[in-house]
Each structure stands twice: as C-alpha cells, then as structure tokens.
Design a protein with these regions (language model features):
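FIC/Doc superfamily catalytic core
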Residues: 1-346
C-alpha cells in the first residue's frame, strides 16, 4: 500500500497539527467504504492545511476551481471523494453538535449537496444492496414508509439510556448495538455509512471519548462490513447477527487495543475458506523463532507502486486490486463471481 502522508502528524506534540492530521486522515479514509479514493491534488492541499499554510475554506476554494477547470466526466468518482473528504474534515474540526435526528440528516446534506440530488432527504423507496461479506446477500434495511419514525425512536431510546454503573465492556457493546441499529435504517439513498461514521464520531466525543487515532481511516471497509454482520441473519445456515466484529473495531478505536481487524474473517463462508487452505505442519525447534517469522507487511503487494509504473491504470482499478488483496488469502483460489462481489463490478 502507499505510505500514508498523514500518519506522521498523529505523532505530533503540537495539538493543532495532530488534530488536523487526524481529521484529514479519517475524512479521506472513510471514502473507502464506497471504494473511492481522493486525488493527489486534495492530499497536497490537505497537507498545506495541516501545516497552517492555508485554511479549510481555502482548500475548498482551490478544489472548486480545480474541478471547474476539469469538467470532464469523472468515472472513478474522484471529485466526489475529494469534496466529501474536505466536508468531513470541516465537520470533524467543529465542536458544535446536537444529538438529534435533524443533526444526522444535516450531516448528510452538508456532505453530499451538489453530489447527490437527494442530499439531506429521506428516501421514499425501498432498497437492497448485494454485500461481499454476505456472499451477495443483502441486509434487510428500514422500510421507506417508517424511516422517520424509526430514526426518531432510536434517538429517543439512546437519549434516555444511562451508562452509569456500566463496565467498559458493557458500554462498548451498547455503542455497537446503537450504531448498528442507526445504520440499518439506511435512511438515505446513498452515503449512509459515511454519514453514520461522522455522526458517531461526534457523538462519541460528547461521551468523553477522544478517538483521535487512525482506526476509522485504515479500517473503513471493515467498519462497514461489521455493520452488515451486525444486521444479518440466515438461521437456516447457522448465521446470526452479531456485534462481535463491531466491538473489536470499537475496542481498537476507544481503548487503543490491537485486535486483528480483517475483512475475510467476517465473511459468512469463512469456515469453508479455511477448509480450502493448505495445511501447514509445525515442528518444535530451539531455533531462533524471531528470525523465522514471516514479515506480513513486507509480503503485502504494494498496489500503489504499480499504479505509478503502469501507464493508463486508473485509481478505481487500484482500489479494486487493494480490495481483492484485503479479501482473499494469497493462496486462495477465487473466480469471477467472487471478484464481482468484492468490487461491485458486473
């Protein structure tokens, strides 16, 4: 993978730079939930903002001018990724927040005005979405006729919930249930996961959680898949909705734990995948184990590097390649249908 230019800022002692770095890294990382990747132009502008050379408003103006001069059709949705990224960074940089359905809807409007016609509007039609993690099945999303009432009910229930006396395990479980239920309503036609993530981060702050690390930025697709698994049942095949994956994510986010967050572990057919993997024989030895450990990071394919060396390869193709690397073992055999499920290509 390409080096993250924002990671160094998370180690900064200067609070302003550290927080700006977190806001930008999260904003850009969240685009991965829809398979989007911002432009290098935005990344460069973001770094200038973190360094204090330009303001967020100036970044926005630069970006608007950039796309006015580049009006051609953007098939990989880079313009959407760029504009939504700066809007997320701006919202995360603001302290104002109210725990209300209107705030939730307002965040969607702020993120997607000029991008989606339905920005800030509750959908009036029912939806299904094929999910890779469910092997092509869909979550049952909220009914169009009941969306507003369902949203208001979830907010009312959470607002009157008391965290007093709960252990941290109980708090994290409850937060996982709350955000999973909020996302399942899927009140908008598009942009639900990014809206939910931004709202949830803002809400966590009101509960006293800092959450200024790179967990959302580096595991945005995991977050979405964990939300899916928290809302899916197939009892006939022994599959039950579970918040266990979401809780692992939250423990890393809120408690700085180092739980393994791997998408393929959530796949409903993961056990079958294990059966197909070659067996490895382990032998006890007094040898220096440290020298024999596999350096997983070095084994990962640097997809971004190939994008620079092969002319004509698009950012969208690179994103699809990254998703495939994340979803399958290097020894796993997979066919066209699995590729379509992971990438959304048909």
């Amino acid at each position: 993978m390409q080096t993250d230019p924002f990671k160094e800022y998370l180690k900064q002692q200067e609070p302003d730079k550290k927080y700006k770095g977190y806001a930008w890294q999260t904003a850009i990382g969240l685009q991965a939930v829809d398979g989007l990747k911002p432009s290098e132009y935005l990344v460069d502008a973001a770094i200038q903002n973190i360094e204090g050379k330009i303001t967020l408003d100036e970044v926005k103006n630069l970006l608007d001018s950039y796309y006015e001069e580049k009006p051609q059709k953007n098939h990989d949705r880079t313009e959407e990724a760029d504009k939504v990224s700066i809007r997320i960074a701006k919202i995360l940089s603001e302290h104002a927040f109210s725990f209300t359905p209107n705030e939730y809807i307002s965040i969607h409007r702020k993120l997607f005005t000029g991008i989606y016609d339905h920005a800030g509007k509750i959908r009036d039609y029912n939806i299904t979405k094929k999910e890779w993690v469910l092997n092509g099945a869909t979550v049952i999303y909220g009914s169009a006729s009941e969306l507003r009432k369902t949203l208001e009910y979830d907010f009312m229930k959470e607002k009157h919930y008391s965290y007093k006396g709960l252990s941290m395990d109980e708090i994290i479980h409850h937060l996982a249930v709350f955000v999973a239920n909020l996302w399942q309503i899927h009140i908008f036609g598009e942009g639900n996961t990014r809206t939910t993530a931004v709202f949830f981060i803002k809400y966590l702050r009101t509960l006293g959680f800092d959450a200024t690390n790179d967990i959302f930025a580096e595991n945005a697709w995991y977050f979405r898949n964990a939300l899916v698994r928290a809302n899916y049942n197939d009892l006939k095949h022994g599959i039950h909705e579970t918040t266990e994956y979401l809780e692992l994510f939250l423990r890393n986010l809120l408690l700085d734990e180092k739980n393994l967050l791997q998408n393929r572990l959530m796949h409903v057919d993961y056990k079958e995948m294990l059966v197909r993997e070659p067996k490895i024989e382990y032998k006890t030895s007094e040898a220096n184990i440290e020298n024999r450990k596999v350096n997983i990071q070095l084994e990962k394919v640097n997809i971004g590097m190939f994008g620079e060396k092969i002319s004509g390869i698009s950012k969208k193709t690179i994103q699809h390649m990254e998703q495939l690397c994340d979803s399958f073992d290097k020894n796993e055999i997979f066919g066209r249908s699995r590729v379509e499920e992971v990438t959304g290509l048909k």
